[in-house]
């Protein structure tokens, strides 16, 4: 899944990642036990969270503009999560989407985590994207890395996050809110890593300046976070930075039935749908709200997109 994505908001994302980069899902929740029957626009609107992951692909910008404008007119999208890559000086898609009036959560790519002068990196990113207030520092950092490249432990990440936090508070006070890396939403790895991050770093930080992030594709599995989120992290806001299901026919049901669970179990203030477009083939395709964007204006829209926008 997106496994990639300003004053700084450090949010720890606790569920899964994405195609072509940090954003890419690792698990999906099947609402198979939910009541049968069609989902109404009112049911979707009542549970939907107006946030979505967007890949920064300039080749499909016309379709992006069209789809995001439709969602914006319907009042269904207020913000997007987009990845800031280390191999590009500036991403024009991030700039364009931000200029449309959307709040951007900038996901600082995992590639940046190995820069020796991380403070200088942060300074450059702040300068390049002055319009961004929320910045997520990495995504599922211990699992979404090149198989033959460098690796990072949660202990090393905690030290790095603390460096960035201290730099932002001293050099850029009030500039950004930092969002922690996304913790995995399934199994024990995510809760264990978040507990370590809390002990080593978050307990010593201002909850008004940091957001905890979780990637949650299987809401039934996130109950393991409840003790931590109602205990040591009870003062911190929580964002689910990736969620969704890889089945267009079940997307609306997932929003209706699973989004309330994410709010209940995780205290989720926001849920970012994964993803607007996850490529036309591959593991992320069926999470998409649109497909075949190069066919604009005749690109495909998912049933959930239709319910959200009122388009057939």
Where are these regions (language model features)?
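Aromatic-lined carbohydrate-recognition surfaces of secreted/lumenal glycan-active proteins
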Residues: 160-194, 214-216, 236-246, 268-278
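An active-site-proximal structural segment forming one wall of the substrate-binding cleft
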Residues: 112-137, 153-171, 192-208, 260-263
């Amino acid at each position: 899944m997106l496994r990639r994505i300003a004053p700084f908001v450090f949010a720890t994302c606790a569920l899964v990642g994405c195609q072509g980069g940090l954003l890419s899902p690792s698990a999906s929740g099947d609402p198979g036990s939910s009541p049968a029957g069609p989902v109404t626009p009112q049911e979707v609107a009542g549970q939907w969270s107006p946030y979505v992951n967007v890949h920064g692909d300039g080749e499909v910008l016309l379709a992006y503009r069209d789809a995001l404008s439709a969602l914006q007119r319907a009042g269904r999208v207020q913000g997007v999560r987009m990845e800031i890559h280390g191999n590009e000086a500036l991403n024009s898609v991030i700039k364009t989407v931000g200029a449309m009036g959307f709040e951007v959560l900038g996901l600082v790519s995992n590639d940046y985590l190995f820069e020796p002068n991380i403070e200088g990196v942060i300074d450059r990113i702040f300068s390049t994207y002055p319009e961004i207030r929320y910045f997520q520092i990495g995504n599922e950092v211990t699992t979404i890395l090149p198989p033959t490249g460098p690796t990072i432990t949660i202990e090393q990440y905690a030290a790095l996050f603390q460096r960035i936090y201290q730099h932002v508070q001293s050099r850029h006070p009030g500039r950004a809110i930092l969002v922690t890396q996304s913790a995995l939403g399934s199994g024990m790895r995510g809760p264990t890593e978040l507990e370590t991050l809390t002990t080593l770093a978050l307990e010593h930080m201002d909850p008004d300046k940091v957001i905890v992030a979780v990637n949650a594709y299987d809401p039934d599995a996130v109950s393991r976070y409840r003790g931590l989120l109602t205990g040591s992290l009870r003062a911190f806001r929580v964002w689910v930075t990736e969620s969704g299901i890889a089945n267009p026919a079940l997307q609306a049901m997932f929003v209706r039935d699973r989004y309330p669970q994410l709010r209940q179990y995780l205290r989720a203030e926001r849920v970012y749908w994964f993803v607007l477009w996850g490529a036309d083939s591959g593991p992320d395709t069926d999470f998409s709200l649109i497909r075949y964007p190069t066919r604009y204006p005749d690109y495909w829209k998912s049933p959930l997109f239709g319910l959200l926008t009122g388009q057939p």
